[in-house]
Amino acid sequence: MNTLHIFDSVKKEKVEFKPIQEGKVKIYVCGPTVYDDSHLGHARSAIAFDLLHRVLKVNDYEVTMTKNFTDIDDKIIKKMYETNKTLENITNQYINAYKADMKALNILDNTIEPKATENLEVMKEMISNLISKDVAYKTSDSVYFDTSKDNLYGTLSHKSNDENSQARVEENQEKRNSADFALWKFEKANDVSFDAPFGKGRPGWHIECSAMIEKHLAYKDSPYQIDIHAGGADLLFPHHENEAAQTRCSSGQNLAKYWMHNGFVNINGEKMSKSLGNSFFLKDVLKSYSGEVIRFYLMSTHYRADLSFNEEDLIASKKRLDKIYRLKKRVYGIEDSSVNKKFKEDILNALNDDINTSIALSVIDEMINSANDKLDSNPKDKNLKKELISNINFIEEVLGIGGNDAYAYFQFGINESTKEKIESLILKRNEAKKTKDFQTADKLRDELSSMDISLMDTVNGTVWEKL
């Protein structure tokens, strides 16, 4: 196995990744709260840790990738009453929409996708355990976690108790400490609630993830329950800090050996989020750009750095991706052989250095430029073509781009009825050329050109692409 280095949020530095169990990796990524459609911020987090998943697999690790769905939350309940829909109708709608978006981005399937509402019993058990240890206590409105009972509280986010207190928004005069947070919210009018030994209500946000990790992933004989816990930088505090505290005090284990966080997507200098009302829904961006172009754009900046959304950069990313597919067209129909050793090493060296996609994509740019020069000099070199298609297949394996049909890629955004019209005009043009009616053939080409369709006459027939 190659040596992978990742940036650990606790140590605030790059460290060598060493799994808890040899050859196996357990990862938990905080998934969406399913009350609305996904935006580019969700896409960025998904792509960042999909890249981690792919790099680990290429390094021969067996990966258990888990991403949850928060399907019980204040925002979901608010949506219920706004739309007069059931909780299940809303959450299923947005879970399905999220999965469709992830498919468009070529995100590898998760091993486990737990829902909060399907794991209530383990949440109740954890809360009961914390109450029995006097680490949690009841007030009139909730069961709270007592942050003063955890000496390590704040060590993940590197915040002092004063900073933690100022950052909290849960104000209740019955709380022992201003930083204490709700584990279980007691039933209110027009609320969704579940029976529990400590009172009818519903779980707080933080306990959900701790409980799902405990149930589905946790090593029992290790100081750490899982290898990597990941999510957006906005989750570092309070969400991940609170998760870590709950698990420490409940099980005596550390939640994760490593913590990883991706940067924001910013709009006009502010983090993109639904609550701020400045988010670009992924489904809307997908109307103009393929998921593959969006993927390329979002991984062109290192995952830890903030990214300022700019459509000009999105267009530039498409042009770079176009070059991969133009090369793929030049080696179309060739069987692969083996990846160029130096190319593979250069890509892996970049990605094993904390998933450095910027360098990896630069290596690809250089390979494409060199390949085109070689093909220009010797267009019939089959061994070269076999190596190049192997290189492109490796790019898809480790970066998730370049795996689609080269001709279909350049036809993105054309609906079926328009495709039928284009194919019909091409057939008419071909017939006109056969009968040497070049005037008609030229008129048909001009008509297609007015539709922003470019034609290329090849030995295998006429192919077209959208300009």
From Swiss-Prot:
It is found in: Cytoplasm. It comes from the Bacteria. GO terms for biological process: cysteinyl-tRNA aminoacylation. Binds 1 zinc ion per subunit. Its main location: cytoplasm. Zn(2+) binds at residues 30, 209, 239, 243. Pfam families: DALR_2 (PF09190), tRNA-synt_1e (PF01406). Keywords: Aminoacyl-tRNA synthetase, ATP-binding, Cytoplasm, Ligase, Metal-binding, Nucleotide-binding, Protein biosynthesis, Zinc. The keyword Transferase does not apply. ATP binds at residue 274. A motif ('HIGH' region) lies at residues 32-42. Its cofactor is Zn(2+). It catalyses: tRNA(Cys) + L-cysteine + ATP = L-cysteinyl-tRNA(Cys) + AMP + diphosphate. Its EC number is 6.1.1.16. A motif ('KMSKS' region) lies at residues 271-275. GO terms for cellular component: cytosol. Belongs to the class-I aminoacyl-tRNA synthetase family. Monomer. This is Cysteine--tRNA ligase.
